[in-house]
Amino acid sequence: QMDQQVQNDLVEKITHRYPEDRIFAEENGLRSPISEGSVWVIDPIDGTNNFVTQKEDFAVMVAYFEDGIGQFGLIYDVMRDHLFYGGGEFPVYRNEVELTPFVDQPLENLLIASNVGMLEKNDWGMADLGMDSLGIRVYGSAGISFSKILSGGILAYFSYIWPWDYAAA
């Protein structure tokens, strides 16, 4: 399975360079506590269904934590060749371009992203919130959704997700 191979490659490179660091990752139950020591959080292919069916709108996500505090993250939109990186004390970039912070605007001028399940059930008022916004987008990948937030294309992403889905954001 491609997810497992990508994760194995990332884990091998990280542990070779940082042998004392630990891993928290989606595949194979690698679950070192994020709150203890130096921990890398990995989602090898976020948006696996998109990867398999469309060959687009998927991302590789890696984050680094020290004693439970995120130091930086990387989100790689593979098919667009966009690498988002930074966070914590570092500015945020897309490839070589520093991204500008969000500028507050009325909700009716902004797009939001969600997963289909939250919209269908109106969980937490998602469908209602969508009616008050410019519109809702469903990308099928937390990494792609977060990259849209970082680029200023959407305001927020709402979903039921795991730590490896949001750690890099």
Q: What is each residue range found by the language model?
A:
Residues 1-45:
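N-terminal subdomain of lithium-sensitive/metallo-dependent phosphomonoesterases centered on the IMPase/IPPase/PAP
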Residues 3, 14, 48, 77, ...:
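Residue-level signal for inorganic ion chemistry
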Residues 34-93:
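DPxDG-like acidic metal-binding loop motif
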Residues 71, 99-101:
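Short, isolated positions in well-ordered beta-strands
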